[in-house]
Amino acid sequence: MKKFIYIILGVFAMVSCIHDESNLGEEPISRLSFVKTLPKEYPVEKMSRFVLEAPEVKQENQEKPLSYEWQIDYEIVSTEKTLSYDCNVAGEFPCRLKIYNEDGAVFYEFVLKVPYPYEEGIALLSAYGGESMVSFRNVMQEGEVFQKHVYRLNSPNVSLGKEPKSILYNANYASVYIAAENPVKVVRVDARTMEVQNVLKYPEPRLDRMIERGKYGIFFVGGGRFLNMDCKTENYINTFQQALTGKWGSMPDAYVDDHIIYYEGTWSSKTVIFDRTSKLFLVEGYMGPERVYEDILCDVLLAALPAQNSKNYVLVFKDNAGQIKVAHVGVDNVQVLSQYSDTKGSITESSCFLTSKKETLLYYSKGNEIYRYDYQSAGNFPVSSDYTVGETGDVIKEMVFDPEEEKLYVALDAASGDYKGCVYCYDLNTKALLWHERGVAGEVVRMIYKK
């Protein structure tokens, strides 16, 4: 019992001693804090020098000598009060400044943003002077203009085929794919720098179009054949094509149209093609190709575009009587929801098309006019156009939205001029023209919006 009491008394004595020592004539601790609220991001141009003086700090109780430590991308780059750093690489870099004295420290974290040369904007693939050409315009900053020949400028050692065919952006891998013929070549470039990352081993002799297959794949179509490619491995799958025209295929004369209908559900996906030979729509089934959309008597398929409902598509086609029609179809359940003839005659075989993800609207062109048709309006086609773009004689070739569907970008070919490609940008809510640039490309082939 005495031992227990002695131990307890000893503990109290030790605690008492510790408490007493903390107050025996020590100087007050110098506490640090920043004087002002500090920015979280600094934009700096590539190949320039970033200079930043350490922000002012307040030392409470006592002033003591200060030291500095600057980190960029988790590496210490300076111990001076003023940071001087050469920004030679584009990207967003986490930064941290540590200001400290012998008593403590404060930390300031921020992001150094060195923009890539080709960030969010419009990429235009065109034919100019017997070559494939890519033009680009950043759209997030005021005063930007199109830059011509951006692919050739950044990838001079890998030429494209002379006949441009298609351009596609995959946000998941931050890549742009550019396809051309003569010779057939598909390149993958960094979407932010336009520098070649890889030349794909494309196995077919023809290539007319690339079509997005969900987030992770691409359909390649050309010469009546099609493949789908996994973007991660860049391996090709052609089981559907083999079921059509392979050794044991059921339709050896099938000629796959350039427009592919694709739906990707939670647990499964569906791919529908149009065979130009048999004039049939076919879906990949367990026992081979199966006929679908039998109520649609299609002779020429002009467009196949995703509808507002992700399970549906909008088809524009010329039927076997020469009438141009618009059909609304389900892909998940492969049903024809509606089909109506264009009684106003505004749709032509050279029209280009675009569908909205916000509304049940099909945009289509005729010359330099743009019309909008509600494909749930039971065939109520518009009498007049919504937009007149450019000048008399101009011909619209491509239309795209920005991801938020706030702006409409229209690419057209001018009637004359060396560089015929022109781009117009409209506010979708007011239909007001926001800007336009003429002479920015050769003859327009494809246009994309990329983040």
Question: At which residue positions do the language-model features occur?
Answer:
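Bacterial Sec-dependent N-terminal signal peptides
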Residues: 1-46, 102-116, 122
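A short beta-strand segment in extracellular, disulfide-stabilized domains
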Residues: 43-60
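Solvent-exposed loop segments of extracellular immunoglobulin-like
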Residues: 60-69
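Repeated scaffold domains used in trafficking and secretory/extracellular systems
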Residues: 154-171, 202-218, 223, 242-269, ...
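Structural motif
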Residues: 129-137, 183-190, 224-237, 268-288, ...
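Intrinsically disordered, low-complexity segments enriched in Gly and acidic/Ser/Thr residues
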Residues: 325-420
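Surface-exposed, flexible coil segments in extracellular/virion-facing regions
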Residues: 68-87
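Blade-level signature of beta-propeller repeat domains, shared across WD40, Kelch, NHL, RCC1
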Residues: 412-451
